[in-house]
């Protein structure tokens, strides 16, 4: 078993512990096996998550005042309530999707693991390790921000415990899925590099066949399975992104903290959503599949013509490649690549402006009511 496969097994182990992909890895046959015990574990874990998220959503809906932060304005408290409920809904949806399509996910991941075994590289191995280290560091930062921020803001004990539990668990689950998706894309990129090297060496038939298999998998199962997951995850991160800056504007910059607390709260608010945004940017910037696929066409244009049937095959491939765009999408709503980053940051800035406008309207209403 290659060293890269061992690194990918870290993701599989973490996903198994969190009840998302409960399989055992057979290293001899590079096969994922679902046992009766793992199936029971998946059912029980998913059931607990569905019950817990539903209970949290209902509690927040029936008792919104319990989650109010005294130093925050009405707009901010409403926004925080929306984020909490949305997080519960997204966790609910993710576990429903993963359990309902567990057999499709198993076949997909197993196929990519076998591709990884054939096309392993030390560069990809380092990327897997770096992703895991980054995931751990951002989890610690996220935990520290939430604990310190909500404690200093004066949130009551019960809602504080609920917010910590829901948000930290959501970060662990959703960002692990983002990291795993990034790693799968890196495996497929390594596969395309491998087959492009075969093309350079003159092995056209094998190289083109392998390349088409990867792109078919990318545009088919990978797109459908993970595109559906990425849609609610990206939407949630987009919703959460303005919360830190808005809290900073509404409390710290308006002097609602003591002078000795301002600096630490300024730092906490500034980095509040940083872990989520780093994960999202990493997922969207990992775009090696499209880059390597485009390299194939450039290589084939340099192949000398021989006057045989191979020339016609290359010409057909190039014509097809002009129409084919191996871009991963969130179920067709937007592309999961670097082109989406600018649109997302524009949307975040727009949401931020809207929130600030509502805050100003609230302050104006309070001023009028005083007279």
Curated annotation (Swiss-Prot):
Keywords linked to the UniProt accession: Cell membrane, Glycoprotein, Membrane, Receptor, Transducer, Transmembrane, Transmembrane helix
Spans traversing the lipid bilayer: 42-62, 81-101, 128-148, 162-182, 229-249, 264-284, 341-361
Primary site of residence: membrane
GO MF annotation: an example: taste receptor activity
One example of a Gene Ontology biological process annotation: signal transduction
Glycan-linked positions: 73, 363
Gene for this chain: Gr39a
InterPro entries: 7TM_chemorcpt (IPR013604)
Similarity comment: Belongs to the insect chemoreceptor superfamily. Gustatory receptor (GR) family. Gr21a subfamily.
Source organism per UniProt: Drosophila melanogaster
UniProt-listed Pfam families: 7tm_7
GO CC annotations on file: axon; dendrite; membrane; neuronal cell body; plasma membrane
Protein name: Gustatory and pheromone receptor 39a, isoform A
Signal sequence bounds: none
